[in-house]
Structures are given as C-alpha cells and as structure tokens.
Amino acid sequence: MIGLNHYLIVSGLLFCIGLAGMLKRKNILLLFFSTEIMLNAINIGFVAISRYTHNLDGQMFALFIIAIAASEVAIGLGLVILWFKKYKSLDIDSLNAMKG
C-alpha cells in the first residue's frame, strides 16, 4: 500500500528538481517550467496530507495554487513572447539590457 511517506517523498523530489532547474537555468521559459514543477510538487504534498487527515483544507489550497499558477502562466508567457520579439533572446542575462 502506498502511504503518506511515499507521496511526500515524491513531492520533495519534484520540488528539488524544480529548485535545481530554477538555480541552474538561464532561459526564462525554462524558469517558468521549473516554477510549475515546484508548484505541482506542493500540490501533491497538500493533497496527500489532506487525504490522510480526512481534511479538505489541503485540497482547497491545491485548487487555489492551480488558479494562481494559471494566471502566472497567462501573464508570464505573454511577457516572454513580448520579450522575445524585442530582444530575440530568452536569456536571463539579457535582462540587464532593460532601461526604465
């Protein structure tokens, strides 16, 4: 039987993979993907704890995080498209070229 520990281990591993992607990558699009992996890892943890404690609070938090992640993707990808059209690059290092 799959217990709570298994779900939390998978959640922790996914979070570490997302964190490593955030720290290692210099591409804005890959940073968004890493953020989504981290948010989904948190969702797995919330839903697993919610399931084993018979409390719906974790599932409500997961739905809230999904809604926030959807808005982040919509706004973030729009900004990434505009950034690519203007600078022809998605590297984080090109952010230093911003003036404002």
From Swiss-Prot:
InterPro entries: NADH_UbQ_OxRdtase_chain4L/K, NUOK/Mnh_C1-like. It comes from the Bacteria. This is NADH-quinone oxidoreductase subunit K. GO terms for cellular component: NADH dehydrogenase complex; plasma membrane. It is an enzyme of class 7 (translocase). It holds the Pfam family Oxidored_q2. It catalyses: a quinone + NADH + 5 H(+)(in) = a quinol + NAD(+) + 4 H(+)(out). The gene is nuoK. The keyword NAD applies. NDH-1 is composed of 14 different subunits. Subunits NuoA, H, J, K, L, M, N constitute the membrane sector of the complex.
